[in-house]
Amino acid sequence: MLDSPKLTARQQQILDLIQTAIARTGAPPTRAEIAAEFGFKSANAAEEHLQALARKGVIELVSGTSRGIRLRGEAVRSINAARGTQFHLPIPGISQLMLPLIGRVAAGSPILAEEHVDQTYSVEGSLFQHKPDYLLKVRGMSMRDAGIMDGDLLAVQSTREARNGQIIVARLGDEVTVKRLRRTAGAIELLPENPDYPIITVQPGESFEIEGLAVGLIRNTMLM
C-alpha cells in the first residue's frame, strides 16, 4: 500500500466532506458548498485547500466544471486505512454487492433484461446510502456540472417515483437518458447539467417513464 499522505486537520475535514457528498448524492461538492460548510469567506479559500489536496495526490481537479473533483482511490484508501476507518471507496472483499452493468438499452425492453447486462461488478455496499440495483454507464457530458462524466458508472435504484430536483434515469420514447427532474404546473422537464445541452420537455401524450433514481457514482477507473 502507498504511504499515507500527511494532511492537515482542515484538509482531512474537506476530504471527508467530499467522500460523504459523493456517497450521498453521487456528486462532489462545489467550491461554494465547501466554503459554506466550513465558514470560509469565499470559494477561493476552498479552492486553495483543494489545490493542496491535489498536490498531495489525494484528489484530481477537473477544469471546466464546478464539481470537477475526482478522488484518487489508492491515496484515499491509504489515508482511511491509517485512520482506522473504512469510508466510501470500493475495497474488494468488504460488504460486497454484485451489481449488473447495463450497456445500451433496446427500445421497448426492460432495462434489466439479460441482453442489456454487459458484465457484473463487485462493489462495496457502504459506498451507497441507498442500495442500488444496477450500474448504468454514462454516455456523453450532459450532466458534467453535476460531476457526472462520460464513462462514469451511475448507481441506480429501480423506482417509478422521484422528487423534484432529483437525478433520474428516464425513458422518453425509445431513449433512456440521465437528467435532473423538474415538474411544473403544466409540464415535466428533464434538465441537463451542462449549458451546451437543451432542456427536454416531455410533450403531452409522449411516452415517459421514470426508470430509476441515481444513488451514487463510481468513476470507471476505480473498477479497473
From Swiss-Prot:
HAMAP family (UniProt xref): LexA
Lineage, opening ranks: Bacteria, Pseudomonadati, Pseudomonadota, Betaproteobacteria, Burkholderiales
Protein name: LexA repressor
Family: Belongs to the peptidase S24 family.
Alphabetically ordered keywords of this record: Autocatalytic cleavage, DNA damage, DNA repair, DNA replication, DNA-binding, Hydrolase, Repressor, SOS response, Transcription, Transcription regulation
A GO biological-process term: DNA replication
Gene coding for it: lexA
Catalytic site: S142 (for autocatalytic cleavage activity), K179 (for autocatalytic cleavage activity)
The EC number(s) this enzyme carries: 3.4.21.88
Self-association state and partner proteins as the record states: Homodimer.
Organism: Paracidovorax citrulli (strain AAC00-1)
Superkingdom: Bacteria
